[in-house]
Amino acid sequence: MVGIHEKYVTEKYNADGELTELKINCPDNYNFAYDVIDELGRRSPDKKAIIWIGEDGTEKIFTYADLMRESNRAANMFIANGVKKGDKVICILKRHYQFWIITMALCKIGAVLIPATNQLKKKDYIYRFKAADVDYIV
């Protein structure tokens, strides 16, 4: 089975095993969420993709199949609420696993993710919303 990266990267090595050439072969329709995460969800569904540990020590493990399924659910929820390709979505979440699900979901839709820390002040949020011409806030 060809490694996923081999579809998108051509590497050449010399006799000493040193990389001598690297070429990126990224098609115009490349989508990390579909082409990598979902492909891993099909090839290695039970392999761990994310291990998240909360501030209270709570542990949550996501396999690639989980990440594929949950990002599909989130993408469908965003679409049902009007988010479409090209929309700018600012995401303000504490360090939480939901950030990664939302990231993959927006990637699948073709929306533009604008990450922002939850530690900003009101004036900072207002500035970002206006400067980025934000369509949606999470």
Predicted regions and their residues:
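Short beta->alpha connector loops at strand-helix junctions that form conserved
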Residues: 116-117
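Structured binding elements
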Residues: 110
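Structural motif
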Residues: 90, 136-138
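A short N-terminal helical cap/helix-turn-helix that marks the beginning
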Residues: 2-9, 28-51, 69
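Conserved AMP-binding/adenylate-forming core of the ANL superfamily
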Residues: 46, 50-104, 121-126, 130
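Active-site charged/polar residues at nucleotide-handling catalytic sites that mediate phosphoryl
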Residues: 131-135
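Short acidic active-site motifs
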Residues: 7, 14-16, 123-124
